[in-house]
């Protein structure tokens, strides 16, 4: 976690007191004020297994008893602390008294039923996440997962090897919850996506497909990359090749990755750190969003030295590529939204917009030509997950970089003391999805803007002005007279340092820790823009 920029402090409950400390008042934990709670359980904590040949109804009853116990803890923790919670599913014992029949009648069968029920339970509780202990135990191997000597002497539920595996996986999940997952995978080509060098070996000399073990390993790696792309990870190429040779390699009949799979292709002989900086500029993303994969250690060393915020992975040998990238956990997700599934198409549409802009002599004429339409409306349940995701991963156009849980998004939406707005922008090139959020806390005649953010994909389209106009209208309807905006500087959000000034706010106070701005709504007039706004009540969109 330290390597990913997190320096946590910990509260640890007494041994085997997880239920009591979760379900009842816990002053020490309340004073600690956790941002995240981890409930570590295993199959050893299962209170009661069904008897052999127990009827289906009895098994179902025991499953429900375990789920009721877990739900009591979850509800209590969510009510008292309003933070994210991680809970394990159940691993398997290292022994099977029924042998292979255990999967049909014994403990294995019951644990599988518990894990299925747990998935259903967690889906009913926002901001609760599952650590897949069942998978981790299989990854280590059950014979190595449980150390009977450690258990009987020290009550360790797993071996040291198992503990290390859990700790690493827990750090990946924690980083994902707090918005630290990466967004872009930058790939070299020669001897990374395929074997060989296209400029020297030609198309026929490239190693890819099923003709050899090496060829199969490269094909498998490309299939894995496509899986990442399909769930929203952006792909880019950074290769020392001519652009023509890069496209030639991607045209190979066994190549699974095609030019259309990449949000950006940089194939030239510039230093790779400069190309990566250019990719970041074109995609409007910070360098800390990138993972760089290259078989050449010299290129990896260059990028690590020049761009320390870029994650650089030692990818190993071709047969290790998938394992090393997967186990690094850079792209760990906590949810999947429609925006994730459409992300590559959205960035490709952005490229079309950039090309179209060159045809206009004035930027205003370009904006008018986009035929932009936006829904700017209060939060609603269908989009809670996307809103939490956007809040937790937006760093640059974000005035406060306040993070939240899914439960907090739900609370804001339902509270009469909050104004919530989201912005979804569409134009003639496509749907950008939900790309802007504002959250204001009402205090008398003042609305404090705790969150104001926007995706960098829609910079310079004036959506922020449309959002401000809608917010001001809603605030006036609630008899609010003053908006207060807050800017808390970070290494990444300098682009919004003057946002409230540009909105017409007056600077009230300024310190190293942040600035406070104020807007008198009685004097405020709407900002002009080129967006047709729907407040969510009209079907004309």
Region locations from a protein language model:
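Conserved Lys-Pro-Asp/Glu-containing loop-to-beta segment of HAD-superfamily phosphomonoesterases
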Residues: 276-297, 303
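Basic, amphipathic juxtamembrane/active-site segments
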Residues: 199-223, 308-315
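Extracellular glycan-modifying ectodomains
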Residues: 1-186, 193-194, 199-200, 204-205, ...
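Substrate-recognition element of Asp-dependent hydrolases with the DxDx(T/V) motif
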Residues: 220-251, 266, 399-404, 408-409, ...
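Acyl-donor binding region in acyl/amide transferases
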Residues: 425-428, 434-510
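A conserved beta-strand-loop-helix scaffold within acyl/acetyltransferase catalytic domains
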Residues: 375-454
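Short hydrophobic/aromatic-enriched beta-strand-loop microsegments
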Residues: 9, 259-264, 310-317
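Terminal substrate-recognition subdomain of acyl/acetyltransferases
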Residues: 282, 304, 308-370, 473-541
């Amino acid at each position: 976690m330290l390597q990913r920029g997190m320096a946590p402090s910990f509260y640890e409950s007494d041994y085997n007191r997880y239920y009591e400390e979760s379900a009842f008042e816990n002053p020490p934990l309340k004073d600690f004020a956790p941002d995240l709670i981890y409930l570590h359980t295993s199959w050893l904590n299962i209170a009661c297994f069904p008897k052999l040949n127990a009827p289906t109804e009895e098994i179902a009853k025991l499953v429900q008893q375990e789920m009721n116990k877990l739900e009591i803890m979850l509800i209590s923790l969510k009510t008292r602390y309003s933070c994210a919670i991680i809970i394990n599913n159940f691993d398997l014992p290292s022994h099977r008294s029924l042998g292979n029949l255990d999967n049909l009648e014994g403990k294995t069968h019951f644990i599988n039923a518990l894990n299925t029920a747990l998935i259903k339970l967690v889906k009913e509780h926002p901001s609760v996440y599952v650590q897949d202990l069942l998978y981790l135990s299989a990854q280590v191997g059950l014979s190595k997962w449980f150390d009977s000597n450690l258990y009987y002497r020290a009550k360790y539920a797993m071996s040291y090897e198992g503990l290390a595996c859990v700790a690493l996986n827990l750090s990946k999940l924690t980083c994902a919850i707090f918005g630290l997952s990466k967004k872009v995978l930058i790939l070299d080509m020669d001897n990374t996506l395929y074997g060989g060098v296209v400029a020297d070996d030609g198309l026929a000399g490239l190693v890819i497909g099923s003709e050899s073990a090496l060829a199969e390993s490269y094909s498998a790696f490309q299939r894995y990359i496509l899986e990442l792309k399909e769930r929203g990870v952006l792909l880019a190429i950074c290769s020392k090749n001519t652009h023509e040779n890069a496209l030639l390699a991607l045209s190979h009949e066994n190549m699974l990755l095609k030019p259309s799979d990449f949000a950006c292709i940089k194939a030239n002989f510039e230093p790779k750190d400069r190309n990566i900086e250019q990719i970041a500029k074109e995609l409007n993303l910070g360098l800390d969003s990138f993972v760089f994969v290259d078989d050449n250690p010299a290129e990896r060393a260059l990028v690590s030295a020049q761009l320390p915020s870029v994650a650089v992975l030692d990818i190993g040998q071709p047969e290790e590529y998938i394992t090393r990238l997967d186990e690094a956990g850079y792209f760990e997700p906590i949810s999947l939204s429609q925006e994730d599934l459409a992300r590559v198409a959205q960035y490709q549409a952005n490229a079309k917009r950039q090309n179209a802009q060159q045809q206009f002599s004035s930027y205003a004429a370009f904006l008018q030509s986009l035929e932009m339409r936006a829904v700017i409306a209060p939060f609603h349940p269908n989009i809670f997950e996307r809103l939490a995701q956007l809040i937790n991963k937006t760093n640059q156009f974000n005035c406060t970089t306040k993070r939240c849980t899914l439960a907090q998004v739900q609370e804001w939406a339902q509270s009469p003391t909050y104004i919530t707005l989201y912005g979804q922008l569409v134009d003639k090139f496509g749907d950008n999805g939900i790309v802007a959020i504002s959250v204001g806390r009402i205090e008398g005649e003042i609305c404090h803007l705790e969150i104001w953010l926007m995706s960098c994909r829609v910079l310079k389209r004036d959506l922020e002005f449309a959002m401000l106009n809608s917010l001001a209208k809603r605030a006036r309807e609630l008899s609010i007279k003053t908006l207060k905006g807050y800017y808390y500087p970070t290494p990444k959000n300098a682009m919004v340092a003057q946002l409230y000034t540009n909105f017409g706010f007056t600077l009230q106070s300024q310190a190293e820790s942040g600035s406070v701005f104020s807007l008198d709504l009685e004097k405020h007039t709407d900002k002009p823009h080129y967006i047709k706004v729907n407040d969510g009540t009209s079907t004309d969109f």
